[in-house]
Amino acid sequence: MPQIIQLQNATIGYPDKVVLDHLDWEIQRGEHWAITGPNGCGKTTLMRTLLRLIPLRSGELRCYDVEGKLTEGLVTSYLPQISQIDRHFPIHVYEVIDSGLPDALKPAKERWEQVQHLAEATGISHLLGQPIGRLSGGQLQRTLLARALASDPELLILDEPLSFLDRSYKESFEELLSTIVRPETTILMVTHDLQAGDQEHWQVLSLGHF
């Protein structure tokens, strides 16, 4: 698979604080990376930089399209930590998924069919009419994953997707990723929960241990 992202001699952080320095990292299309490390080591700051929410302090961040040419924008989806979601917000599962669809001008019938397809793929068809406040942690995570996949992303960034989930949901979520995410989709997962047996499926970038 060709390269999708390259960080070269990158300094990452904020105007008053350097979080990561002299970072070199190359990511190929279709690779699955687990970003690990202690709290405060820069995992979230790195993801925010890749999402271009904060600028590089110095160095180079290059993104490449499917033909290997430099591009300013990748089709990227972000799955936040479920602890960041306001469960009291009055929105239903089908509305959450629909909000991830890229073309707001599509006919309502076509959008609904896409929502149903994504809900079926993530095993939440029976929950489409439920408000998010009634969902379990695992059900909410699947809802957010369906939304993230709605744009058919080239790059999928998962921020602590296994936190606050019990063991059975963790296993089912990992299995879900392997079955419904396209092989050519690149996945970056911030996690504290990577088990030794999972490391054969994930390349690991360990921060705070340079």
Residue ranges of model-derived segments:
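Conserved ABC ATPase signature
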Residues: 131-135
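Conserved ABC ATPase "signature" region
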Residues: 110-127
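Helix-to-loop junction immediately C-terminal to a conserved catalytic motif
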Residues: 51
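Conserved catalytic motifs of ABC-family nucleotide-binding domains
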Residues: 152
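H-loop/switch region of ABC-family ATPase nucleotide-binding domains
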Residues: 191-192
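Catalytic Walker B motif of ABC-type/P-loop ATPase nucleotide-binding domains
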Residues: 156-160
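Hydrophobic anchor residue at the start of the ABC signature
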Residues: 145
